[in-house]
């Protein structure tokens, strides 16, 4: 059986769901923008037309070519043998999507395409096919992308989302395919595996969600409901195969014991829903009745699923907005009081209504109902559902949204983020750096540092001066959260916050909480675990990026001693270059983290040393010599594990002398610290060859903070 390339289009946001749907049909596909592509036979393509609840169009890919002018476009379309696809006595229609660098006018592209096809038929048959934009036999689609033109032949003439059952609809109709998508995303397919599946739509409108749920429950192929469905009239079409597949689909229908219940307060829309349910032939499983959502009661003994698409706020309610918000407040009450154990999914573009419910969302997914951007909010109704104990994330979101309304100072912060990102982009592209500092208190009133870790942001608030009103400082902090979310398109849950201040004693090594949220990042050829929530720092110091590279380069196939090694990131880089490493740190937690970093990079930890010890005490007793030493002590430490308090300005001379005692005569010591007022000991400068390498170690993303660290290269004098 010959294979072809097909594209199944869908609404933006449901591509992965469509891919899963095709997987269930035994068709392997790859996700693309607004659809999926798959290799297969016409039998596979027909199955998608018949069974897909989500696809809009199934298209045969005919050809793709780069074209740069109108003649090239004409020649490309002419090079396709259209007589292989349809007869001259069939009518066709051309549709254009996408954008092309050289063609601004899609009508021009359509006309050129039509001319090329018609001219070919005239040359070959002395006749021309008709153009029919209302009732074509075939649809030729051109998708434009950059300088490329992709040519498709559509298998279905009408969009697959049309099921024919919706004879009557309300003011804001929900597309059938989107209704199916939110049901799948909400977990209806899993619910159907239960002995007694239950679905309630408490604001059912004209019944689209209820009907789509019933089609899935009864295994009714959507195309069977489409009385006006029309396939392409192509020479490639296999009518016998199509009819055989339709018969198989009809026989696959089954009864169900699912309970599918709809409610609405409006008798007029309930009447429409009743007629639509009858048209769809699912009146045996779907029940509807009039009820105010604030009076919703659980009359069932087992848990189920609630899915609804309420009216979109001001668009339908206008001056009744206050009533709408009151409705949702009451809905939240009913859910938390009477639907324990249930799952709830609400599709809306009006987030104010969701806030009024006072329930914690477990998931949020963006969908499009035509051109309207909407969000599917999901909830688990349990003891944690109500806003009784507000999480830090929920608090951040609430205060961030509220702070944005109090003043417009944060606009400057937003503009600075945009400017910094624009300035850094060429460097980021050239260097391959994925984790970087975007902002570092560039605007005095927004005293925060913004570090980017892929899709996550680590936001550090510098402790406000005592003269600054703490309420104002806190408001600006939440405004910063708001603008990071809006400007950088970072999800609130991926914005991790910390207040920067001196930590004392064991605070330096203790967790903030016990979530154990580790993520993997890349730094050049190495991978590291980072944790944004559980510790005071993430597990990697971004400002040390360059000195880690220097240390690794110097340590190639040599021995490295990493003092105050933290999570052993410098050791990993060195080990990847063949170094044998010894990492010393007081914290067993960080050393274990370091071992995990080694294993993440497929490095054998048995070939490297990890020593939990006070570095000063260990250096005093050490007799081994190393080729390279990396000494990166904290500015201040008074941990009980240390014999004494460490003050880097006071103690660096002792530390360097001890480290040099463990260095080979031809070796090199890299010394770094973050004390801004640090002054190197004159005795050390006189005793050794000391070169300040601050500029060498300063990355592009830290140029605005040139005093962030002090870096020295120290060697024995020859």
UniProtKB/Swiss-Prot annotation:
PANTHER family: RIBOSOMAL RNA LARGE SUBUNIT METHYLTRANSFERASE K/L, RIBOSOMAL RNA LARGE SUBUNIT METHYLTRANSFERASE K_L. One of its GO terms (molecular function) is RNA binding. Its EC number is 2.1.1.173, 2.1.1.264. Its main location: cytoplasm. Specifically methylates the guanine in position 2445 (m2G2445) and the guanine in position 2069 (m7G2069) of 23S rRNA. GO terms for cellular component: cytoplasm. Coiled coil: none annotated. The keyword Protein biosynthesis does not apply. Residues 44-155 form the THUMP domain. The gene is rlmL. It holds the Pfam family RlmL_1st. Keywords: Cytoplasm, Methyltransferase, RNA-binding, rRNA processing, S-adenosyl-L-methionine, Transferase. It comes from the Bacteria. It catalyses: guanosine(2445) in 23S rRNA + S-adenosyl-L-methionine = N(2)-methylguanosine(2445) in 23S rRNA + S-adenosyl-L-homocysteine + H(+); guanosine(2069) in 23S rRNA + S-adenosyl-L-methionine = N(2)-methylguanosine(2069) in 23S rRNA + S-adenosyl-L-homocysteine + H(+). It comes from Francisella philomiragia subsp. philomiragia (strain ATCC 25017 / CCUG 19701 / FSC 153 / O#319-036). Belongs to the methyltransferase superfamily. RlmKL family. It is found in: Cytoplasm. This is Ribosomal RNA large subunit methyltransferase K/L.
